[in-house]
Structures are given as structure tokens and as C-alpha cells.
Amino acid sequence: NAWVYGDARVSENAWVYGDARVFGNARVFDNAWVYGNAKVYGDARVSGNAWAYGEVQVAGNAWIYGDARVFGNAWVYGDARVSENAWVYGDARVFGNARVFDNAWVYGNAKVYGDARVSGNARVYGNAEVFNTRHFFVQGPIGSRDGYVTFYRTKDDTVEVRCGCFSGSLQEFVNQVEETHGGSRYEKEYKLAAELAKVCIRLEGESR
């Protein structure tokens, strides 16, 4: 039941199916897939090997490309770009001139906008509100599993942490580290990362 209408174009090996809608001046091309109840409209582009599916909306001048995935109830709009191996999903919103790329994930109720650049192995989650590249900090490989830890600004102008299956405030993170890794080198690593995040992340009223 997919619809393609207006001046929209679907070309090359691209697929649009399910109840997806592509309209306005939107373009879906290369090997891109748009399906489910996804809507791609305005002057938006989905290309490369990118997938947009679920209840997503891709609008304005947004462009999803590379091997990027946008799914769930996520919205990407404005002049935003999602590329490479990045994922945007859940109820996340990426807009403005924001860029999400490399292996970064933006999910939950997170908002990334303005001139923010979210990249590397960042995991921006939950109530994150990132509109400046100084609103998040990633450290890794770190810890007993050589993983990555992401510290990010929230809509309440506080710092939260995502590390593996852990998600919580900065103090909750430190408490968890002490409980799990107390007395080990990993405790030192994580605590140093937390202290560095406090210095690097800019909260409201702080200059860049």
C-alpha cells in the first residue's frame, strides 16, 4: 500500500513498500529502503544503503545515507544528516543542522539539534538534549569490557551517563562504579572519565 506522489522520486535499486509514503520533492535512491509507516517528504533524501522504517518521519532538507538506520517513532528534519553506521530510533528527534554519524546512536526521547555533531561510539539516550558538540563526551575503550561510556547533557541541564546497560545520573554512575569495581584500576578509569566529563560538558550559562 506504499504511496509515491507529488514530485517525489524513487530510483535505482531503492525500495518503498508497506504503508510508507514518499511525497513532496523527496528522493529515495541508490539501495535505500523505506517501509512500514515511514513518511519521507519535503526535500528530504534517503540514499546509499540507508533504511527508514516504522513510524518515522524524514522531512525538510534532511538526508539519511550511508548505512544509517532510522526507525521506531524517530523524526529527522530540518537540515539534519544521519550517515555512515549511525542509528536514530525510539522517540528521538534530530533536527536543525545536527549531524549524527560514525557508529553513534541517538534513541529514547533524546533530542539532537542546532549545530551538534554526534559521532564515534556515542550513545545519546533518554532525556538527552544536545544542541552543541560540547554537550556530550565519549570515553573508550574503557573498563573491564573495553567498552565506551557516553556522558551527555539532559533537558534538565544535568549530566547523565550511558555505559553498557547502565543509564543514570553522574552520581549514580559513580556509585555503581564503586560498587562493581571498587579498588580496581577500572574504578580509577571510570572516575577519571566522570571528572573529565564534568569539565568538558558545557551546561546552560557556561561559555564554550
Ranges and model annotations:
Residues 1-131:
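Thr-biased low-complexity repeat/linker tracts and other Thr-enriched repetitive architectures
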Residues 126-208:
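Intrinsic low-complexity/IDR segments
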